[in-house]
Amino acid sequence: MDGIIDNLTSALNTWNSKLAEIWLLLTESPETFKGGDIWKVILKVHDALQAIGLALLVLFFVWGLIKTCTSWQDVKRPEQAFKLFLRFIVARALIMYGMELMTGIFEIVQGIISSITETAGLGISSETVLPQEIIDAVSNTGFLESIPLWAVTLLGSIFITILSFVMILTVYGRFFKMYMYTAISPIPLAAAAGESTQNTAFTFIKSYAGVCLEGAIIVLACIIFSAFASSPPVVDSTASSVSMLWSYIGELIFNMLVLVGTIKMSDRIVKEMMGL
């Protein structure tokens, strides 16, 4: 019967390790992720696109000038000239200091995440372990009775393992989205130079802030699941070993599905909350 226990324990260990990895990822900066090698590449791409962004800045500025000013006399008006000059300066600053802006947004969200974890009194997630009642019941099961237990265990282990990888892939996906936003930022930020195109730059900044805020939603979901994990599903010791195991795995997988579903929908939740 050790094989049944080992299968479930292995699946739960995979889940616990991925959940612990999520906590580390959510508190890690993109600059130090994977030793900082990815960040160095992103910086090179960002610097290369800055030149293109500055060229687009002029294009968007001229296009906005044509769209908003009906004649040369409009441009010569002091208030209009100052407005155009200020818009150009702000747009250029966004391109030149866009990296600092995005890093600042990320640090603010990291502060929010730290406040949530400190307030909840959590720094690491509670581990999900197999109850002793289940271990004792399976150990006392005969050979013939163990056949359905193998089926239940294999299905449960496969399902838990799949959920573990879906969960961690979603969190890694958030990291890669932040890298993509940072690398390509000079292009959409250049749109701030034109009055008719400025919404593109503002939408980009709000969208990046939304990606960062996904981390706060994921942390809250992990905290809620940790509360579930600290009070595991109730095990009916009077039931048969098959019923006991099936009931436990079913309730455990349901709790895991809630967590994985919330993590997968974190982007949608942020958009609904913040109107992004």
Model regions and ranges:
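Alpha-helical transmembrane segments
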Residues: 189-206, 269-273
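Alpha-helical transmembrane spans of integral membrane proteins, capturing the lipid-embedded, hydrophobic core
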Residues: 56, 60, 64, 84, ...
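Transmembrane helix-loop boundary segments of multi-pass membrane transporters
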Residues: 170-178, 202-213
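Non-cytosolic segments of integral membrane proteins
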Residues: 92-184, 218, 222-275
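Hydrophobic transmembrane alpha-helix segments characteristic of membrane transport
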Residues: 56-92, 184-198
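Binding/recognition "hotspot" determinant
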Residues: 1-56
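Alpha-helical membrane-interface segments at transmembrane helix boundaries
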Residues: 42-50, 82-86, 90, 139, ...
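Alpha-helical transmembrane segments and their helix-start/interface "positive-inside/aromatic belt" motifs
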Residues: 1-7, 78-98, 201-211
